[in-house]
Amino acid sequence: RRPPRSTLDRSSAASDVYKRQTPEQKEQWLKPLLNGEIRSAFAMTEPGLPSSDAKNICTQAKLEGDEWVINGEKYYISGAGDPRCKVMITMVQTNPDAPPHKQQSQILVPIDTEGVHILEGMEVFGHDDAPHGHMHIHFDNVRVPKENMLLGEGRGFEIAQGRLGPGRIHHCMRCIGQAERALESMKKRANSRVAFGQKLSDMGALRHKVAEARIKIDQTRLMVLYAAHKMDTVGNKAARKEIAMIKVAAPRMACEIIDEAIQVHGGGGVSQEFKLAYSYGSNRTLRLADGPDEVHLEAIAKAEFRKND
């Protein structure tokens, strides 16, 4: 078994707890998270629903006295299989009669709470990513203190939007790193393999592939740096188009370069002997995670046509 895919690592409660919780909850969760003593998961996706539209959340939380009672089902919850995972930020519907973007809330749910049932893990391109996992979870009358709600009732969609921008930039940074690793592996292989009396690295076609890969990596790196700079200087909302652009460009670029590296490695490239096949699956998954390409392309198109309004 391989270590968990870094691109699917969603142990990301720390930033939300830091920004949106009480001093007591920071003491309980933030310190051990930052110290690496525990892990966390973000539970939003549900079976049978388009996860790119968070307004469709069906898992419900109802306030009974001083407790929220949660019932529902979550799917593809990355990190929840890790025995170190101790808490989930869970997206729930708290008021179905509110305006669409105010129906959802986010609640801290300790993973050992009675009624939390972690079912089977899912395989991604044949890998189970144990122990990290991508889990199917049932919430059956799960009770947590009302203080576990983040920021306040009806602000779940707002929190989700605020956390996705930085998260997408992090994903794209990792895409660049994996593309760099694939390029290094491709050059090393080309320097060590001789075919028909000639090193692969001396063949013009392959040399051009290496050059093209370098251009693509550096183009994407500059796009990512610009998006990160814009988010830092003018904010997440103002950088929305640039973040959407890199979320499409970076995984595509990484997949292209890893695919070329696989080709240079021959049969070994798709075997367990190298990390390329696993890396390809990881980056291909990112064309779906945190919003599929189509959603981001539509956001980019809207921003472009808005210029002419």
Language model features with spans:
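Alpha-helical interface subdomain recognition
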Residues: 20-25, 32, 36, 54, ...
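Short Gly/Pro-enriched turn/cap motifs at secondary-structure boundaries
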Residues: 8, 48-52, 78-83, 96-98, ...
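Flexible, glycine-rich active-site loops centered on histidine and acidic residues
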Residues: 15-20, 42-43, 97
